[in-house]
Amino acid sequence: MNKLNVLIAGSTGYIGTQLVKLLCKHKNVKIKYLCGNTSVGKNISAYDKDLKKYKLPKIIKINYKLFKDVVVIFTSLPNGESQKISNKLLKKNIMIDLSADFRLKNSKIYNKYYGIKHISLNSL
C-alpha cells in the first residue's frame, strides 16, 4: 500500500507537534510538508525534542501549490486561518481542521463566540 502524503499547517504549536508524533507512528502516512509562518527553515524538533528521532522535512511557508502533492491537509492554526486554506483545496484534498474554524455550523454563532466573520460559509 502506498503511503498517504499529508501536509500539516501549524505544526509547531502543542496540537501540531502532538499530531506530528501520532502520524510518525502510523505506517501508512508520510508527512510530506510541515508548514508554519514564524518557524520557516527550522526543524520541528526545535519545538518538541521527542521528534529528533524522526526524519522529518524542515518547516516551510504554506504554499497552495503544495496541495497537489498531498491528499490530507491537517490544520492547527489560529482562529480564522484555516478557513482561508479551505477555499484553496483541490478536489482530491481532504482537510482535517484541529482549530475552531469549522467547529460550529452557524456563521452567526461563530462570529459571536470568536469575534471573526467566517469567510468560508460553503464549508460549514
Model-identified regions with their sequence ranges:
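N-terminal Rossmann-like NAD(P) cofactor-binding subdomain of oxidoreductases
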Residues: 1-124
